[in-house]
Amino acid sequence: VCELMPLTARTMHHSCVVRTHTHLWNTHSPYNLLTGYSGPVINGNHFKPTDHPSVGSVMQLAGLGSAGVPNYVWMPTVPGHSQGRQRAGPYGGFLGQRFDPLFTSYTPTFRESIEGRNAHIDPPVPYAAPQLPALDAQPGLGAARLGRRRDLLAAVDRVRRRLGDTSSDSLGVFQRKALELLTSTRTRDAFDIARESESTRKRYGEHLFGSCLLAARRLVESGTRFVGLTFESQLNGKIGAGQWDPHGNNFRLLKNFLLPTLDQCYSALVEDMAGRGMLDDTLVVLMGEMGRTPKVNKSAGRDHWTQCGFIVYTGAGVRHATVFGRSDKQ
């Protein structure tokens, strides 16, 4: 851990660093990381219904989790959204849509001018909190109204079964589950980070990524078994802002934006979970899709380097305060 991450340095006694993460797929798609299978070789590949299911989806299939909260959540929304893509990886694949994660939504605001900014090399900090899309994005569609829709759906299902029509049973299960989650008090409470103290919210950071990690801790406390977070956001709804892909301006990006943001919210999560005893049975994984080139390019950036990267494992099931592996001259 470098000098630009002093808060994270205080938490490393909870962690294990693996310095030999390697694979063959030079792409931003997290497919191989989340499924364990060979990923797409083209960076723009979107998910397909024939893909292998993600780890979170398999956990749902196994019935792990608690009633009343989503078992699998991805924040701030679908991976790749900042570039207009839906990258393969976190979905249910051939298991079906009902094993997809619950994708949150968000509306970023900025506390500095964004006019003329190149979000890829000089991104502004996005501020937002993850939202439940169906309830927060549609005015007037509150919990009571959704509850009435759920009751109506149940009545229609009963009539259909009496008539022997089972053609849409799987869709009915999916719809009922979605309605139950969206009307669940436990779900809405878990996403309500305003219930946290002001000092806690400021410790995580009021930016998008701090808000997402605070919501993640609340979800895990409520019984959610798998939470994913992609460090990316949108600027003007078109350009990515905040992702870790420094092909240019690498050193200023790390010093002024990427590392301070990560240092604040990641260390807050680890310290908070440790203080609550949650690291005993929760694994926190910090990683990227690949490493970055040892050589600096002409734009003062580092390009993709799948040959070697690192992963930080924190919490349950790992040997704490340990470093594994080392790179070689190649």
What is the role of each PLM region?
Residues 1-330:
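Ligand-binding pockets and gating/stacking loops
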